């Protein structure tokens, strides 16, 4: 495998490993600890893909967290003290991310970096992502760059209350061995301001907004059905900017708000009430 120690890590696979069709790329965004990865894992579970051998999976998950830049010694020292802003767009290797997604969309097998959140470093080991029919790419800023945003065939935004997100982040970082005071200082100094400046404004690019994350099974089930239709070949893959100009806008906030399909070209009136405070 290619080394991930500071160099570009994605590498195309041999021609024999490439599929005959391009995958359907779904972007999943939302604030820190909003439940993005949990939503993706639930989708995988409901599709019966989480027990499938990696090479045979029709749906795969990839995280933006894998594309954090390699830190200098000075930056790593700050990171270990909770004084480095991991929620800023510049914290990510966007060029590598774009090239990797481009290769994925072209149906190639790629190798992606592995990031250690305890030591704040990119590990030598890489992870192989095999071609799949549907790829879920999740992260706090996956909609920030237009170049990357425009690659998605469907965009989901997981909209979870800020207090819930904070409590989840505290529990997660404590499990990583972080000090509570450091966690809270980092949240107020970097995480919350970055969410409001960089992540929340990208909510407007979402086709489907999912309040309460994985607890919102109305939205999850609808998305799963949509993906199942794609896997079954019942829905033609659509691309933004096409002749029909299709886009889907929908927010699912209340029990019973479950149309039979994603609503084309409009947002639900419930969306304005789902913004975090």
Curated annotation (Swiss-Prot):
Domain of life: Eukaryota
Pathway annotation from the record: Pyrimidine metabolism; CTP biosynthesis via salvage pathway; CTP from cytidine: step 1/3; Pyrimidine metabolism; UMP biosynthesis via salvage pathway; UMP from uridine: step 1/1
Keyword Transferase: yes
Active site per the UniProt annotation: 65
Residues carrying Phosphothreonine: 251
One MF annotation (Gene Ontology) recorded for this entry: uridine kinase activity
Binding site for substrate: 87, 115, 120, 169, 178, 186
Catalytic activity line of the entry: uridine + ATP = UMP + ADP + H(+); cytidine + ATP = CMP + ADP + H(+)
EC supergroup of this enzyme: transferase
Residue ranges, annotated region (Disordered): 1-30, 247-277
Enzyme Commission numbers on file: 2.7.1.48
GO biological process, alphabetically ordered: CTP salvage; UMP salvage
Keyword list, A-Z: ATP-binding, Kinase, Nucleotide-binding, Phosphoprotein, Transferase
Modified residues (Phosphoserine): 253
Role played: Phosphorylates uridine and cytidine to uridine monophosphate and cytidine monophosphate. Does not phosphorylate deoxyribonucleosides or purine ribonucleosides. Can use ATP or GTP as a phosphate donor. Can also phosphorylate cytidine and uridine nucleoside analogs such as 6-azauridine, 5-fluorouridine, 4-thiouridine, 5-bromouridine, N(4)-acetylcytidine, N(4)-benzoylcytidine, 5-fluorocytidine, 2-thiocytidine, 5-methylcytidine, and N(4)-anisoylcytidine.
Name the UniProt record assigns to this protein: Uridine-cytidine kinase 1
Annotated source species: Homo sapiens (Human)
């Amino acid at each position: 495998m290619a080394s991930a120690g500071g160099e570009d890590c994605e590498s195309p696979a041999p021609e024999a490993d490439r599929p005959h069709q391009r995958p359907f790329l779904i972007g999943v965004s939302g604030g820190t600890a909003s439940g993005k990865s949990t939503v993706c894992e639930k989708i995988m579970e409901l599709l019966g893909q989480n027990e499938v051998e990696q090479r045979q999976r029709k749906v795969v998950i990839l995280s933006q967290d894998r594309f954090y830049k390699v830190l200098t010694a000075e930056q790593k020292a700050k990171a270990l003290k909770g004084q480095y802003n991991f929620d800023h767009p510049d914290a990510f290797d966007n060029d590598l991310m774009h090239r990797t997604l481009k290769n994925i969309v072209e149906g190639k097998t790629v190798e992606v970096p592995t990031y250690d959140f305890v030591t704040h470093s990119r590990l030598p080991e890489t992870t192989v992502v095999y071609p799949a029919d549907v790829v879920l790419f999740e992260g706090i800023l996956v909609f920030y760059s237009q170049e990357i945003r425009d690659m998605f065939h469907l965009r989901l935004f997981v909209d979870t209350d800020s207090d819930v997100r904070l409590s989840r982040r505290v529990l997660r970082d404590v499990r990583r061995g972080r000090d509570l005071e450091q966690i809270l200082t980092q949240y107020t100094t970097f995480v919350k301001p970055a969410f409001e400046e960089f992540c929340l404004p990208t909510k407007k690019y979402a086709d489907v907004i999912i309040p309460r994350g994985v607890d919102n099974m109305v939205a999850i089930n609808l998305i799963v059905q949509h993906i199942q239709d794609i896997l079954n070949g019942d829905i033609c893959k659509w691309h933004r900017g096409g002749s029909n100009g299709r886009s889907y806008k929908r927010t699912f906030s209340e029990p019973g708000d479950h149309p039979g399909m994603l609503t084309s070209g409009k947002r639900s009136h419930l969306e304005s009430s789902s913004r975090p405070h």
